[in-house]
Amino acid sequence: MSAKMIERPNLLQNNKEYRVFLQEHSILFEYKMVCIQDLKGIYVIPSAQNSFLWFGVQFVRQGIYQGGVFRFTITLPPNFPDGGCPKVVFQTNVFHPLINPDSGELYLAWNFPEWKRTNRVWSLIQFITKILTKVDSKMTPINQVAAALLETDVEKFQKLAKESVKNSLSQVYDPPPTDDPHYITFSPYDNDLHDPIKEEIYQPKEERENKTVGFSWVQPGSLQPFSKSETR
């Protein structure tokens, strides 16, 4: 048996590990791209236990669903960045033409008929905000009832959409369904904990800039290290 044949299993193992490394790098790159985008009112983070699963929450600031706080997950395909489109599933029931009323899955084929390597996850996240901010009657629906009401009885559609908003708010403080430390959770406002943070945020910019940070051993007006006399 030749030396090359003996070494082949190790080579295959190394190739597999390298592919995993490249895949993890691709996922980290996608998340970095998400972080640098100016995405309004939507927050996502990969699971601490599974980088193919991302947790997200959308705060809707305008439109029919204004005021809603909708949780969702993004699941990347096993062979990402190749393969099909990532899957978005809402954890809150959302009455919407593009959201499956039974599974909560968002019908992404309307905007991403074919997922390519050049597609970015941040654009998918941006699409989530878009469909909750402005409902387009031209969308190819997955929820036929919602689509029909949008066309024939807008008032009733808006009423059911507002019920989705109300339900989402009633679940904001629910305990997490997983022990994953990256799952996004919220707690009620605590005056002792949050008031100092709020005051810091609303502090005038000039005061924050002039605030002393740390210690200095340099005498004002001098560039010589340790020129400042020690004070006790």
Language-model features and meaning:
Residues M1-D102, K116-N119, S123:
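Strand-helix-loop interaction patch of compact alpha/beta domains
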Residues S2-L12, S137-R232:
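Charge-rich (especially acidic), low-complexity segments
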Residues E30-V34, T75, L124-I131, A148, ...:
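Alpha-helical recognition domains of nuclear gene-regulatory proteins
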